[in-house]
Amino acid sequence: MTLIAAHHLAVRRGRDEILSDVSLSVAPREIVTIVGPNGSGKSTLLRALLGILPAAAGRVSRRPGLRIGYVPQRLQVDGTLPLTAARFLSLPRRRAPAEVAAALERVGVPEVADRQLADLSGGQFQRVLLARALLTEPELLMLDEPTQGLDQPGEAAFYRLIEEVRSTTGAAILMVSHDLHVVMAASDRVICLNRHVCCEGTPRVVSNAPEYRALFGHGTQGALALYRHEHDHDHTHDHSHHA
């Protein structure tokens, strides 16, 4: 069963075609990562799937009643506003303190509840955004470059957290990666986008695809770098595609 799909989707901005003939789908519990150069339409694709941007051609289909959690690429917060993390999670819908505390605990930052958003580190703020998205109990979690601005340990830790979210909640993940050569080892599929779908498949298949190499060069021997980590639990998905 498909949760969300694009069918020959095109998106235009004025006379410019940002996306052309894009088709993709996300199944339950699947982790799909979208990579592409700057200006390739990655963020536009997420916004079109969410219904924020209209389709110039083609269409988007969603399973009826699908609950989606969204972590945007950038969220500017006025540093002069007194807004704690706990209060932020209660906007616009008021949440019980216990619910807010549980959400922050779930993403590993229970200590930031009473801290001002402006005082949080980049990694802490991204986790607060994730906590907010998870409050809707999403069946599909959409993340737009969620690790941008994080250092490598912070990036790896956030990816581990995303895997844990999928494992514990069963949510599917559709994520845009800002780093052309870094993709989660847990990704079931990688979609290479440059205004259209250049290629897609497992991380290993995409890293060896001529379309990927033509776009991004050989970089780290032309291969996508895959974050790996030791597991003390079983996943139902296959990790055998580690590079």
UniProtKB/Swiss-Prot annotation:
Keyword annotations of the record: ATP-binding, Cell inner membrane, Cell membrane, Ion transport, Membrane, Nucleotide-binding, Translocase, Transport, Zinc, Zinc transport
Subcellular location, record wording: Cell inner membrane
Cited InterPro entries: AAA+_ATPase, ABC_transporter-like_ATP-bd, ABC_transporter-like_CS, Metal_Ion_Import_ABC, P-loop_NTPase
Top EC group: translocase
GO function terms (MF aspect): ABC-type zinc transporter activity; ATP binding; ATP hydrolysis activity
UniProt subunit comment: The complex is composed of two ATP-binding proteins (ZnuC), two transmembrane proteins (ZnuB) and a solute-binding protein (ZnuA).
Family the UniProt entry places it in: Belongs to the ABC transporter superfamily. Zinc importer (TC 3.A.1.15.5) family.
Protein name: Zinc import ATP-binding protein ZnuC
Taxonomic lineage of the native organism: Bacteria, Pseudomonadati, Pseudomonadota, Alphaproteobacteria, Rhodobacterales
Gene (UniProt): znuC
